[in-house]
Regions:
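Divalent metal-coordination and catalytic microenvironments
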Residues: 13-15, 75, 157, 168, ...
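Short N-terminal targeting/anchoring amphipathic segment
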Residues: 151-163
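Active-site rim/loop-helix segments in enzyme catalytic domains that contact anionic ligands
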Residues: 1-131, 148-151, 181, 266
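C-terminal accessory domains and tails appended to enzymatic cores
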Residues: 2-4, 29, 81-83, 100-150, ...
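A structural signal for well-ordered alpha-helical segments within the folded catalytic domains
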Residues: 19, 69-73, 145, 167-170, ...
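Active-site rim elements
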Residues: 61-65, 162-163, 206-210
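Generic beta-sheet signal
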Residues: 37-39, 186-189
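Short catalytic/ligand-binding loop motif for oxyanion handling, primarily in non-cytosolic enzymes
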Residues: 17-19, 43-47, 94-103, 165-169, ...
């Protein structure tokens, strides 16, 4: 009997797979093996920065390690509820990543101003710029090696297309794109809604966009269970109900025929190739 495919969603953060793919994987989970491997699951209390203190205040916490313990616990509870396997890869979140090759001046400055110790000291501004630091080059290779250990011959691999150009999302895409075959990329929600950007640069690379409309009400229920983040992402309590979008190479049907509801978009609806955020990848 042929082996059934398994599905591996590589999520940058502890909420991203649910936000972008919750409709699809909650549909798949009762039918086959689904795993969410979250990359950036760790934080620390010292050193700290203004960006970290602001993030903690907005989250209602005063301790980064306790916040991330709760986020990991929350993630596993939600995944267990729908029958999805949870893997935390234990890399440090971009907000908290420190320079490993700081020069003497940076080390001295770090004793006065702790921000100098961080790869992204002005995190909110650097996030908008979308430029991945060369300090994260080795990190990308380490993530690739971790994913290689999770991918089998029948694994269907999903990754973010990095809509919105979040640095950690771009790092995960770089760790996967071109290093694994037939990867399916997802459009990052809610960045795609905020930026009105439902396309990507992948059209010029032979990818087709697919639309998924099933289980969206279930997905919104799952998002509301992410108590540590939902009020930050949706302060007015309104979670937009929009289709999920996936990008797969033309000629490759992303899922077995038993999966209903997935449809390729017409050619004229496929892409706008001038998406500025994706072109920075």
């Amino acid at each position: 009997m042929p082996q059934k495919p398994s599905y591996l969603f590589v999520s940058p953060h502890l909420d991203d797979a649910i936000l972008s793919c919750g409709g699809l994987f909650s549909y798949l989970a009762p039918k086959t093996d689904v795993t969410i491997a979250t990359v950036f699951t760790e934080a620390h209390n010292s050193p700290t920065s203004l960006s970290i203190r602001r993030f903690l205040k907005n989250s209602g916490y005063d301790d980064s390690e306790k916040l991330f313990i709760e986020r990991r616990r929350e993630d596993k509870i939600i995944n267990d509820l729908i029958g999805v396997k949870t893997i935390h890869l234990r890399f440090t979140d971009g907000l908290y990543r420190l320079k490993s090759n700081a020069n003497r001046l940076e080390l001295a400055l770090g004793n006065i101003l702790q921000e100098a110790k961080f790869i992204y000291p002005l995190f909110a501004w650097q996030l908008k710029m979308g430029k991945v630091s060369s300090n994260d080059g080795q990190l990308i290779n380490e993530i690739t090696r971790k994913i290689e250990g999770l991918v089998g011959p029948k694994t269907v691999l999903f990754a973010p297309v990095a809509t919105g150009s979040h640095l950690d999302h771009k790092i995960v895409r770089r760790a996967i794109e071109g290093r694994f075959e037939n990867v399916i990329f997802w459009s990052d929600f809610p960045y795609n809604v905020w930026d009105n950007q439902f396309s990507s640069d992948l059209g010029s690379r032979g990818y087709q966009r697919w639309e998924w409309n099933n289980n969206l009400d279930e997905k919104i229920k799952l998002i509301r269970m992410i108590k540590t983040q939902v009020s930050l992402l949706f302060p007015d309590g309104n979670i937009p109900k929009v289709p999920e979008y996936y990008f797969a190479k033309e000629g490759v049907v992303p899922f077995p025929a038993t999966v209903g509801g997935l449809k390729p978009l017409a050619k004229e609806d496929q892409y706008s190739e001038s998406q500025e955020g994706d072109q920075r990848l």
